[in-house]
């Protein structure tokens, strides 16, 4: 028993979040800072392709403006079950209206209702050791315990993170963006960022209080048991099961909305993408090395060699920036039997993007925890792509949203009815009507 206890990992092993360092940032164990934004998303079903392409170009420009080798962006699309108790208790003035409302309510509530939550995380990595001042050299040899509360955030780093967040809030206003902060409820303080991180982990909504100790211990409260092909998330009310997918090879082209099928999926899932900016010199080196490898191997893909040359020229002309990209899809179900059907459907939906999909097995545990900001070391099969590719893959699309309570109700007023969006499968030809871009580097 004691040997098993010694092998048990601490809750903060993979949740490296110490505390709230400021209204805009969480402090991580390694000194990095994390800010999180929540987005309503942009409506896409009836949007004109010109508008879709314009918004894609604007996202690419935004990425170029905030590019820094210390910045990592991470997007989460969380599809989970909606609360069926949020149907507005509206009073009807006639018997016919009451009968119509009762019938409509019964029909809506007989279905499984889903909702999509979109999050954008901004991670400002700690200053490299080469950039430490002489007075801080001694800190390299000081042994720190994980989650040392004595660690403080640099005012300069906090200011830099706040500047990036301000830029994102301004440029993404069309997506209904707001910053996650602390909220007060019944005299208690809760962390919206910790709640979002827990939602990414488990696919379930739950309040996370502000604690005096390590914040990671408040986020990781369900027991995660990793098997050979699936993960069991054992909570107080029962267990749920998860399986993960990743990209083995990137698609030849990317276009805005290439993963929109998942927004209407009949299962719970979390789509995670991370993009760590690369310096121009490092990006040019990756392209040159890839091109030299193809020439040395006498690769017959002449079009790809030409595309690399063109991409290197566009990179030098500041048409885009490059970054280290990773994508994973984690699906959830209430039982292993249901998980098999969900996994088959999820793999098919993800493959509609044109990528080669692989189910995680040996790297399943790493794939599960790599979805959290700050765990980039756990990513498997990352690939270098351009900001234009990432702006297309992370399109920030969503169905129109309302709210029975909270921030959106305060802005838009009291809701009248609950409406359900039906998911429609868009033909491949229609889905690619928007502008597409070749991937300058394809994962092999």
Regions found by a protein language model. Give the residues of each.
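Extended, folded cores of ATP/NTP-driven motor/assembly subunits in large transport
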Residues: 1-395
């Amino acid at each position: 028993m004691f040997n098993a206890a010694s092998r048990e990992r601490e809750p903060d092993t993979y949740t490296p979040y110490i505390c709230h360092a400021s209204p805009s940032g969480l402090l991580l164990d390694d000194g990095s800072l994390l800010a999180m934004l929540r987005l309503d998303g942009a409506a896409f079903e009836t949007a004109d392709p010109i508008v879709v392409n314009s918004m894609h170009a604007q996202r690419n420009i935004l990425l170029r403006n905030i590019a820094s080798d210390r910045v990592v962006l991470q997007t989460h699309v969380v599809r989970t079950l909606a609360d069926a108790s949020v149907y507005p208790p509206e009073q009807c003035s006639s018997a016919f209206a009451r009968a119509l409302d009762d019938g409509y309510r019964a029909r809506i509530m007989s279905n499984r209702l889903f909702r999509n939550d979109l999050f954008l995380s901004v991670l400002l990595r700690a200053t490299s050791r080469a950039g430490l001042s002489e007075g801080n050299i001694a800190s390299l040899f000081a042994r720190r315990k994980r989650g040392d509360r004595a660690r403080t955030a640099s005012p300069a780093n906090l200011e830099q993170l706040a500047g990036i967040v301000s830029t994102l809030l301004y440029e993404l206003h069309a997506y209904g963006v707001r910053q996650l902060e602390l909220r007060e409820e019944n005299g208690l303080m809760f962390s919206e960022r910790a709640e979002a991180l827990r939602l990414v982990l488990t696919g379930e909504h739950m309040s996370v209080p502000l604690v005096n100790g390590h914040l990671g211990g408040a986020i990781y409260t369900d027991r995660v048991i990793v098997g050979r092909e699936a993960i069991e998330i054992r909570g107080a009310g029962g267990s749920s099961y998860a399986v993960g997918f990743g990209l083995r090879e990137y698609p030849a082209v990317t276009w805005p909305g290439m993963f929109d099928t998942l927004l209407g999926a009949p299962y719970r899932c979390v789509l995670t993408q991370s993009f760590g900016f690369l310096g121009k010199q490092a990006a040019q080196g990756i392209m040159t090395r890839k091109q030299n490898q193809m020439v040395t191997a006498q690769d017959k893909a002449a079009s790809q060699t030409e595309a690399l040359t063109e991409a290197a020229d566009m990179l030098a002309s500041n048409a885009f920036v490059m970054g280290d990209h990773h994508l994973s899809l984690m699906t959830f179900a209430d039982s292993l039997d249901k998980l098999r059907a969900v996994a088959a459907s999820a793999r098919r939906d993800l493959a509609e993007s044109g990528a080669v999909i692989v189910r995680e097995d040996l790297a399943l545990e790493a794939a599960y925890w790599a979805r959290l900001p700050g765990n980039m070391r756990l990513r498997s099969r990352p690939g270098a792509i351009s900001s234009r590719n990432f702006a297309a893959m992370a399109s920030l699309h969503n169905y129109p949203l309302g709210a029975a309570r909270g921030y959106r109700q305060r802005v838009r007023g009291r809701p009248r009815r609950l409406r359900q969006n039906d998911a429609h499968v868009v033909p491949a030809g229609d889905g690619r009507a928007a502008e597409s871009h070749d991937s300058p580097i394809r994962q092999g």
